[in-house]
Amino acid sequence: MSTRMEIISSFYNQADEDSRLQRSRHGQLEYAVTMHYIHRFIKPGDKVLEIGAGTGRYSIALAKEGMEVTAVELVESNLDILRKNSRGMDHIRSYQGDAADLSCFDDQTFDMTLVLGPLYHLYEAEDVHRAIDEAVRVTRKNGIVMFAFLSVFGIMYANYFQGNWAAGQKENFSEDYHVRHFKEQLFTGYDIREFEQLFEGKPIQWITTAGTDGIVESIEDRLDFMIPDEDFSAFVNWYLAFSEKRELLGSTNHLLYVCRKL
């Protein structure tokens, strides 16, 4: 049986993660909405930790804005690109590390902690809770912590309408329709309430849960799909007006759970 590290590295070694947030409208929307929420809470000069920084899209952007950024990435190929993209830059440091073990950082070190990918790939409850607890631990009191996660329904809508519905249902749901999380699962999705319940009893105050890319990934392959460049900014603003509506959250692929450390 492959390890989590082997599964994740195998995927990202062949995926073009560096352009993911640029090459499609749903990626561009996800980036714009996530940055909107970051900017809602960040303050000039904040110390920011990004866990699961990928190739550095968010970390590098925030460092350019003058934030003191620490980027942690598990996959070596992603980390190599992050370091190449940030070479010679001020305000950014990068390390290889795992979201489930941040023992290299002291308690209450960062003003804002971003976990924008690791929870896509953690399937065992112990590891999920350890990653959440570690992110909260290293964040200062009253600091902001953001966790990206995937909707299991968004996964179904975006990936299993190509004659493979039965395979998707078996992959993601038990026979009585409970969401499945299991070893060797590359991407794990959640029911919205199920994800929010992970934080019960933890020293945080929930602020909001927001969708970051809506149904765009599910419809972008349509032959008639088009959002012209001149309309994109207005589209983002329109989406942001509804990004926290509970009745829409399940259909989005990517979501953001925003909380404050108590």
Stretches with model-predicted labels:
Residues 1-52, 57, 61, 144-173:
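Conserved class I S-adenosyl-L-methionine
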Residues 57-101:
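Class I SAM-dependent methyltransferase SAM/SAH-binding core
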Residues 103-113:
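A short acidic, Gly/Pro-enriched loop at the edge of an enzyme's catalytic core
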Residues 129-141:
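A short glycine-rich, Lys/Arg-flanked "PGG" loop and its adjoining helix->strand segment in the class I
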Residues 186-203, 209:
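Short alpha-helix
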Residues 208-262:
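A C-terminal cap/extension of S-adenosyl-L-methionine-dependent methyltransferases
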